[in-house]
């Protein structure tokens, strides 16, 4: 795998995690693009970023979870990578894949890893197969909660 040269990173998160990512970008000499909802205007992460771009919308779904809007901002600013932080879009395999499909570097686990670890049963089986100690417990999946009472 070759080295990837980055110059601009879009931080697709807010608050303390965004501050940490932006500081790391700054220390590495990278331009950081923060995105923010109206109620986060003036927050520390928007002040620390090289550029802060407002998101349109009133709810989390319309702002920090709006994949199309975030990808459009990434394209507008010609970012080299997107860092999702944790929570929000970091747990969305479809977003990770959309970033990669757009030709932008994804800073995070692969879409496949996100899918595998997002499902607790698959995660347990994957970890056990890899030899990672797992707390003992039943490995039964059921949509019928009443049937699980008798286990």
Predicted stretch roles:
Residues 2-149:
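N-terminal beta-alpha lobe that positions the nucleotide/phosphoryl donor
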């Amino acid at each position: 795998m070759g080295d990837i040269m980055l110059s601009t990173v879009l931080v697709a998160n807010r608050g303390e995690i965004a501050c940490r990512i932006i500081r790391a970008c700054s220390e590495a000499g990278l331009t950081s693009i923060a995105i923010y909802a109206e109620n986060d205007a003036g927050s520390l992460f928007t002040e620390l970023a090289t550029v802060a771009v407002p998101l349109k919308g009133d709810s989390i779904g319309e702002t920090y979870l709006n994949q199309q809007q975030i990808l459009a901002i990434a394209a507008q600013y010609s970012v080299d990578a997107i860092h999702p932080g944790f929570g929000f879009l970091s747990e969305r395999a479809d977003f990770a894949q959309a970033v990669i499909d757009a030709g932008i570097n994804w800073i995070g686990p692969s879409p496949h890893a996100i899918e595998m670890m997002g499902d607790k049963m698959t995660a347990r089986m994957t970890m056990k197969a890899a030899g990672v100690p797992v707390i003992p417990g039943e490995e039964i999946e059921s949509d019928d909660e009443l049937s699980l009472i008798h286990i």
